[in-house]
Each structure stands twice: as structure tokens, then as C-alpha cells.
Amino acid sequence: MAGAARHGDRLVMIDERGELSYKQLDERTNALANAWRERGLKSGEGVAILARNHRGFLEAVFAAAKCGTRIVLLNTSFAGPQIREVAQREGTDLLVYDDEYSDTLRGIDDPPRGRFRAWANEPGDDTLDALVEGADTSGPPKPDESPRITILTSGTTGTPKGAPRSEPRSLSLIGGLLSKVPFRAHEVTELCVPMFHALGFMQAIVGVGLGSTLVVRRRFDPETTLDSLEEHRATAMVVVPVMLSRILELGEDKIEQRDLTDLRIIFVSGSALGADLARKATEAFGPVVYNLYGSTEIAYATIATPEDLRADPSTVGKVVRGSIVKLFDENGKEVPEGESGRIFVGNLSQFEGYTGGGNKDMLQGLMASGDVGHFDPEGRLYIDGRDDEMIVSGGENVFPAEVEELLASHKDVQEAAAIGVEDEKFGQRLKAFVVLRSSAKLTEDEVKDYVKDNLANYKVPREVVFLDELPRNPTGKVLKRELAERDEKGDGKASPKTNGKAPSKKKESAKASSK
């Protein structure tokens, strides 16, 4: 919290409780750290945090860091069994949580150093506020160990894994970020992404380092976000693509009613932005969209600037300074420009291997991102699809992402996803799941014809299922595992070809939204 000395009374956060200054954050986190140390918390022990976006989250992180602990950021969508599994695996000695998760935490043994409420509906001795009131606000002794942060993977393919990091060995990657995205000192940043997510956490840390003001809310609402951008004269907004899409769905009039002239940066990551959404966002807000390609494990790889997106809105941009990106074929040889290959990334901010054991594939000291892509002559990277999602249909390689992006560009389609399914004739074919725009009508044959008119025949989905919504995790990634499980159970029947709003659609959507 060296920033507190430099930024003092400047606001570090505005949340639903009001304003919090850097000085207050420093003093409150000193008090929390001292209170926890009195309760026996030691360097190297584990502090788990289950909280939404508010000051309590940030206070818990900085207090735990001042104690030199292992900080584990829990996903707020986890069910009780997942919480128990992660807490046991990561070693939780102290737990910080919001009141709304009390039921989720039932049946979980109290950690040895206690559990404390960050967002409390009712006051009590177990709240962070109560600990702060009775504790010394002077700086705690320097811990014996440096703090470590563990961010959990999204869990889209199974049980979330812990991806730990120690203090950064170099600031080169942050320098690379700032060379691509013009974040400045004293930004006012509308931080919509959950801070337990890699993108949200990193932008919170970068913001604090720059003396910025973070504007946060516990739940995302698109219209409230627009109001907040105008009210606080925000200069930057950090979102995942599905959030940006929901803002744009409000319509041109709602956006133009607000004075957003201060907004210089819309920083997007967390899942694929897509060319159509990139175009629409640029049309609505101007050339302020920056698209980051990276992950919890590999950190930053590339960033598409407004100039890159103007040249081609489907690109994820050029390699960030401080990172290395290479593409390899199945034999481990680097592929020529323009050819697809597995994406491998190297930098000094990558994770240290999963806490439960295992790691990502490594080649020549570089880490696999899990995606396949290609470079254009200007050095811009394009994502062709997930390495593990590619199917072979009639001897041809097919990536669902290409079909998904095409379907999303249809005027009647809100969003779409595709998975590979077995096919007697072709070996594998795609199955598409489509969400229509409000009051739109589209038949299965019309969807197939649209793909056939724009892509090769072997990329046309064998089936099309219409849903009310796609199953997603809290940061907007489509849970294709759930779609595949439904297909294996025989629940994913194609909708009748006469009308995309057929009665069977409700049956499909009910299953898609159950969690």
C-alpha cells in the first residue's frame, strides 16, 4: 500500500457504501492485519475470500497481503461442495465472505483462524468493520514471507484449478499493457468484472498502482453502468464481452442520452470478443475498444488496439511487450506466417503450476494457451478455435468458433455456441445452439442455409437447437460442458423446422439455465 502515502485522500473506491480513500484503505487494512495476527494468523497460511465487488474484498486482499499469506480468491458461483473441495485443497486457515453465502458455507468447518463477514446485512463481532474498530491502525510488522495470490480457473471444462502466483519478478508485462492501453494515473475506472477473476483482479491492482478510483457494484446491470459512467465521468471501463453486449442491447438512444465524452478506454477480455461485437461497440462508443487475449495461467499475450480492430475486428491484436507468442504444429515445429498452429506464450507473469498438481503443456519454455491461431503479415494474431474443440468432419478440420462468430453476425441471432457431435457419415459434425433476439423468428433450415451461404458445406451444423439463453459462468464464458452433457443425455433435440420459437424451446432453455 505504498500508494496510500502518495495518494492519501484521493478516492480508491466508490461502491454501494460510498467513498473510500487511499488513506482509509491503508489504515483499515493495517487494523485488519493486526487483528488477524492477534488471532494467530501467520505468514504462509491460507486466507480464502468469497465476496462480490465492494470495499470488503479489497480490504481483505490487502490485509492478507500485509500478513504474508496465501490468498485464494473464490468464485461466487461455487456451490457448497465446490467450496469445500477448494478450501480443503488450498488449505484455508481464515475465511472472509459475504452474508449472502452463509447458506453455501453451511457444513464447512470453521477455519482455525476464524471466518469473518465482508458484506454484512446485520452488524456483529464477526464483521470486518468490527475488527477494524477495535484494532491498531499502525503498520503491522513485515511478514516473514511474501504474499501469494491464487486465482481459480473458470472451470468450464471441469473442477476449477488453483493457479498461484508470487509477487511479480518484473514489471515488464505491466509496462507492456500500458504501452498498448493508455491507462493513466488517476483514472476513474468502472470495474464491472468480478475482482475474483484474473482480469478484474489485475485491473484493480493496476488501478491502485496508478492512484485510480475504482467504481464497483456487487451486481452488474447494464443501465446502471451507463448511469455510473456518466455520473462519475469515468475514463475507463473494464468488462467481459457478454457485459458489453448487454450494454449495447439497451439501444443507441439509451447510450446517446448519456454524456460519455470522458470515456477513453473500454478494456475487454475474459472470452472471445468477436468481430460483430467489436464493430458494434466501436460504432456506439467510438475508437476506444481494447481487446486483451490471455488467460489465468498465461497472463497477457496480445492486445488489439482500436487501430488493430479498425483494420480487422476479428483480430486479438499484436504481442504485448514482455511476452513471447509462437505457433507450433503437432510435431512441435514453428508454423509459417498465415498457417494455423497451437498457441504458446512466455512471460514473467505466468502461473506456477496448478495447486492440485499438473501444468499446461510446455514447449521451448513457452506455455500452451489451449487455443489454435495464426498470424497475419502485420503480426496480428487471430484465434481459430480451442485446441480441444476442433473436430474432423469428412477429413476436414473444423473449429466451432468460426461458425459461432458467423451465426452471431446474423441480424436475428443474439448469441450462439457450437459443439462437436458424432456423425455416422462424416465422423463428426457440429451441433449449434442459438439464442434469438427478442421477437425474432428463425427456422433450423434458415440457420443452416446461412452457414451454407457463407462457409464450406462441411461446416454446416447437423442440428440447430434454439435456447432462451446459453449456460455461462459468472465471467461470461459459455459452459460447453453443460451443452455436451445435455447432448449425451439426449436432451438436446433439434427444434422443429417450422418455427424457431417452437414449444420445445422452453424445455431446452429450462435445462440450459439450471445450475
Go through each PLM region and give its residues.
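Conserved AMP-binding/adenylation subdomain of ANL enzymes
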Residues: 171-188, 196-236, 250
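AMP-binding/adenylate-forming catalytic core of the ANL superfamily
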Residues: 56, 78, 97, 227-229, ...
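Conserved ATP/PPi-binding loop(s) of AMP-dependent carboxylate-activating enzymes
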Residues: 318-322, 333-364, 396-398
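Conserved pre-ATP/AMP-binding loop-to-beta segment of ANL
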Residues: 9, 123-125, 129, 133-152, ...
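Conserved AMP-binding/adenylate-forming core of the ANL superfamily
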Residues: 11-54, 58, 62, 79-84
